Structure formats: structure tokens, C-alpha cells
UniProtKB/Swiss-Prot annotation:
Enzyme kind, highest EC tier: isomerase
GO biological process: gluconeogenesis; glucose 6-phosphate metabolic process; glycolytic process
Source organism per UniProt: Thiobacillus denitrificans (strain ATCC 25259 / T1)
InterPro entries in UniProt: G6P_Isomerase, G6P_Isomerase_C, Phosphoglucose_isomerase_CS, SIS_dom_sf, SIS_PGI_1, SIS_PGI_2
Catalytic activity: alpha-D-glucose 6-phosphate = beta-D-fructose 6-phosphate
UniProt protein name: Glucose-6-phosphate isomerase 1
Subcellular location: Cytoplasm
Keyword Iron: no
Gene: pgi1
């Protein structure tokens, strides 16, 4: 593996960037009537318009060449054939296999991948259908009406995002809720709405040792037992998504009601596995299969389309262009679709936990920027919160806008305004508004020339600010599957270019190691352990507030 900055394509991009410093997208559109057609791409019903970027066709050729020299195609094939590309944990990365309708024969760690996936999916389907048709009943014989998914990180963010996004497709009589935070108000607020006799809990923890998940699960069990007063009730009101049968059984869950997943499925890529049980319970098995099919359609596109016409590659390489040549630190994601209100938190984990790394595959510190800060909110809420910064701030912020052509509610006029606002924002970012135009408008409105000159600079929109637009027909399960897989593969592309491991997450470990002694120090008779001055001071203040000695 050659160092990234020594690759010929990288050096060519450095030279090309010098000629692009003053590139004006407005002029590019004036000079090229076909720019939209040239710099847009379709996959199924999904349209990516990337023409509003500071790129030319030459830029895109250089970026595709960088992908080739970085051996992106080889790494993509290695992932899909079960090689251990998660090299720090010596694991394969096979979330793509979970959504393939026909899986090639593949053995990983002595496990027949196709057979194992098929077996778990079959068990999931039977369970989902038993809840929906009423044959699975609670301890007192009542059917299940509410499901509470207890998990954190990938066991929560993905399923919660999908369930909110596809709420229009929810089955009747079963509602799914999500609890993740260790803060007791999260669980208490959820349980306050529910009837223990008709509530099912899903405990999602691969090891069945995750602190936050087990704390919430034990509290939920205590709530259930306080109401039903029968220890055997746990078996009818709890199921587990785990690999630790012994711990699951000790909790009181029948191991027959444990759905497994594997080390080659990372948490932030796990909604396609048994972790997606809550999704299937919310939208039904057929719609869950449509979600998988949409993701598979994007997988096929990613594996087969040439780099120059490959949607995840284009999105990923545009991110490289801005982060490593234009010096951007963030990118904004703005879904003009309220159902996608949890997409940004999901993408924050997907992107920042995957590519927030500073050591490369050669175990060396990198000398370039890697994962960006991901942020955003649904439109039009974001317009009234932070778009001032995007339009008029001092930082260049690449952005993604997502919007459906057709809404699923009867309020069609509101959707027309939503669509109009989405397109207007991307146009405003591109075109901007000059001081001369603003002065003329102010004078025409009756303002004096001097006052107009004084106010105009504050109303200037510089324009020439980049954005991508992802347009889809409607937000159905298949389309959502495509969108999620698109961003998964985009993150993979960038990790390959940056020569980092996108599939481990060591950054979460240190805080977890430091928490137990701090917890002990907060409530013990005497302060235990040594801490830095700031942490020691905070512990002492908490102890004083609790009436403990310091």
C-alpha cells in the first residue's frame, strides 16, 4: 500500500485544485447547457444531481482515477467475498450478504453464511407473523400491542430511523417504541404509556453485557414482574437479539426466543440482521423484505457500475474532494422529509464512528483529514435554524438535500411547498444574490441610497456553495433501503481512500473503562481512585450536593 499522498492521482488532483480555486458554478452552467445531464445519475427511481458542485468532468476523472489507484475495486470485492477487511479485529464484513436474495456459497470462520442467514430470517418471519396474527400472546393470554426495543448504538439508531421513516407502512394494532438512553426518564416515559399485559420487549445486545441495555432491560423486567407477579411471565414478554445464550437464559428469556447475529455484522450495519426484528414487527415481513431488496439493488449497482457512473463512488469521492482539497470539516444532510428526521443521527454514527480514525492500514498516523463532522435536520426546520451559516457563514459546507417527488399524505399543497423550498435552497446556494441587485431592490422599495448601501452587505448571498440533491419517487421500503445502502457504501469508499479501517470502533472504549471507578467515587463512603483535577473537582461537587464527605 503506497501512502495516499504519493499516488499519482492525488498529485494530479493537487495540481488540478490550483486551477479550480476560483471556479464559479454559475458560469459553468451558463457555458454548458448540458451540465445537469452530464453531472447527474440514476439508480432505479433514485436521482443524484451533483451538478451543483465545484467540479468539472476533468475533476471527476481525476477522482475516479484516485479511486482506482487506491484499489477501491479490489477492496470492494474483498468485502463481498468475506475477506477480513476489518483487520484490527480480524473479521469479515458481510452486511451486504444479509440482503441478497440469492447468496453465493461462502464459508466464514467455518460458518455457512447463506445457511445461517436463511435460518435466522426464517425464524424472524415466523415470530413476526405469530405476533401479528395473535398466536403469540402475553402471559395473561392477551395479544401483543406494543413492542419496546431496548438497545443502544447500532442496535437502536438504525431500527429506530427505519421505523420512523416507514411509519406510513406500519401494521395495525402493533406499535414499536425505542429505549436507548441510560437516563431513567427515557424508559420511564415509555413505560408510562404501556400495559404490561400487552407489551413485548426486545433486548438487543450481541454479548448481553452492554451496560446501558442491561440496565434498561432489568428495569423493564422489574416493571413487568411488579404488574404480573409471575417470574415465568418474562418468557412471554421478552425476546433477545444476542449470541450469549447463557446470559439470555439467566435473564429469564427462553433461548428459543433468542435471534442470533454474527461478528461479521457490525453494529452500525446491523439493521438488516436480527437487529431489524423491530422493523419487521412494525411494517410487516413483506415490507421488511422490500427494504432488503432496495439495499440489494444499490449493492448490485455499487458492485457492477463503472466508477465514473457509480452513485456511492461519486458521493464518496466528492466528499474526498471537499475534505482533502478544499479543506472542509463538515457536511450537512437535509432531508426534506419529516419521516427521515432520524436519518441524521443514524448517519452520524455510520459516518463518524466508521471514519473517525487517525491511523491507517499500515498502522501509521495519517497526515490528512479523515471523517467529517456530520450534521443537519429535516427541512424546512433547518431553514429557520442554521441555514444562515450555510448561506452566509465563513465556512464552506458541502450539503446533501433529500426529497420525494410524491408525498404519502393527503396534504398535497404542503408537499408542493416543501418541494419548492428544497429546490429553492439548492438554487440559492448556487446563485447567491449580489450587493448591486440588493441595493437596487432596497431603493425600489423606497429606501434612501445611503441606507441601501449600508444595509446591502448584510443581505448579500455569496452563492457558489455546493450541494447534492437526491430525488426519489416516494419514501417506501425499497427506496429507503437504497438510500441507506448508498450512504453505507459512500462511507466505505471514503475509508478505502483514506486507508483506514471503517469497521472497528475503538474510540468508544476508553470512556467505558473510566466510568466504573468514577461511579464508585460518586456514592462510596470515601473517594476511590485518582483523577485529573477537573474530574476530581466535579466528583467532589456532586458528593457535596449529596451530603457525602469529600
Amino acid at each position: 500500500m503506497k501512502p495516499l499522498k504519493t499516488l499519482p492521482a492525488w498529485k494530479a488532483l493537487e495540481q488540478h485544485f490550483k486551477s479550480m480555486r476560483n471556479f464559479d458554478m454559475r458560469a459553468a452552467f451558463r457555458e454548458d447547457a448540458a451540465r445537469f445531464e452530464t453531472l447527474s445519475l440514476r439508480c432505479g427511481n433514485l436521482l443524484l444531481d451533483y451538478s451543483k458542485n465545484r467540479v468539472t468532468q476533468e475533476t471527476m476523472r481525476h477522482l475516479a482515477q484516485l479511486a482506482r489507484e487506491s484499489e477501491l475495486e479490489e477492496m470492494r470485492n474483498a468485502m463481498c467475498t468475506g475477506e477480513r477487511i476489518n483487520f484490527t479485529e480480524k473479521r469479515a464484513v458481510l452486511h451486504v450478504a444479509l440482503r441478497a436474495p440469492v447468496r453465493p456459497a461462502l464459508m466464514v470462520e467455518g460458518v455457512d453464511v447463506e445457511r445461517e442467514i436463511a435460518k435466522v430470517l426464517h425464524r424472524m418471519q415466523r415470530f413476526v407473523e405469530s405476533v401479528h396474527n395473535g398466536s403469540w400472546r402475553g402471559h395473561t393470554g392477551k395479544p401483543i400491542r406494543n413492542v419496546v426495543n431496548i438497545g443502544i448504538g447500532g442496535s437502536d439508531l438504525g431500527p429506530a430511523m427505519v421505523c420512523h421513516a416507514l411509519d406510513h407502512y406500519a401494521v395495525e394494532n402493533v406499535r414499536v417504541h425505542f429505549v436507548s438512553n441510560l437516563d431513567p426518564s427515557h424508559l420511564a416515559g415509555t413505560l408510562a404509556q404501556l400495559d404490561p399485559e400487552t407489551t413485548l420487549f426486545i433486548v438487543a445486545s450481541k454479548t448481553f453485557t452492554t451496560l446501558e441495555t442491561l440496565a434498561n432491560a432489568n428495569s423493564a423486567k422489574a416493571w413487568l414482574l411488579a404488574a404480573l407477579r409471575a417470574p415465568e411471565a418474562v418468557a412471554r414478554h421478552f425476546v433477545a437479539l444476542s449470541t450469549n445464550a447463557q446470559a439470555v437464559e439467566a435473564f429469564g428469556i427462553d433461548p428459543e426466543n433468542m435471534f442470533i447475529f454474527w461478528d461479521w455484522v457490525g453494529g452500525r450495519y446491523s439493521l438488516w440482521s436480527a437487529i431489524g426484528l423491530s422493523i419487521a414487527l412494525q411494517i410487516g415481513w413483506g415490507n421488511f423484505q422490500a427494504l432488503l431488496a432496495g439495499a440489494h439493488a444499490m449493492d448490485v449497482h455499487f458492485k457492477e457500475a463503472p466508477l465514473e457512473a457509480n452513485m456511492p463512488v461519486i458521493l464518496g469521492m466528492l466528499g474526498i474532494w471537499y475534505a482533502n482539497f478544499w479543506g472542509t470539516d463538515t457536511y450537512g444532510v437535509f432531508p426534506y422529509d419529516q419521516r427521515l428526521r432520524l436519518l441524521v443521527p443514524f448517519l452520524q454514527q455510520l459516518d463518524m464512528e466508521s471514519n473517525g480514525k487517525n491511523v491507517n492500514r499500515a498502522n501509521k498516523l495519517v497526515n490528512y483529514n479523515t471523517g467529517p463532522i456530520v450534521w443537519g435536520a429535516p427541512g424546512t426546520n433547518g431553514q429557520h435554524a442554521f441555514f444562515e451559516l450555510v448561506h452566509q457563514g465563513t465556512r464552506l459546507i458541502p450539503t446533501d438535500f433529500l426529497v420525494a417527488a410524491v408525498n404519502l399524505t393527503p396534504l398535497a399543497d404542503q408537499h408542493e411547498w416543501l418541494l419548492a423550498n428544497c429546490l429553492a435552497q439548492t438554487e440559492a446556494l448556487l446563485k447567491g444574490k449580489s450587493r448591486a441587485v440588493i441595493e437596487a431592490e432596497l431603493i425600489a422599495q423606497g429606501m434612501t441610497r445611503d441606507d441601501a448601501r449600508a444595509l446591502a452587505p448584510h443581505k448579500v448571498f455569496p452563492g457558489n456553495r455546493p450541494s447534492n440533491t437526491l430525488l426519489y419517487q416516494k419514501l417506501d421500503p425499497h427506496t429507503l433501503g437504497m438510500l441507506i445502502a448508498l450512504y453505507e457504501h459512500k462511507v466505505f469508499v471514503q475509508g478505502v481512500i483514506w486507508q483506514i479501517n471503517s469497521f472497528d470502533q475503538w474510540g468508544v472504549e476508553l470512556g467505558k473503562q473510566l466510568a466504573p471507578p468514577i461511579r464508585a467515587a460518586l456514592s462510596s463512603v470515601r473517594v476511590i481512585g485518582e483523577h485529573d483535577g477537573s474530574t476530581q473537582g466535579l466528583i467532589a461537587d456532586i458528593r457535596r450536593r449529596r451530603g457525602l464527605s469529600t
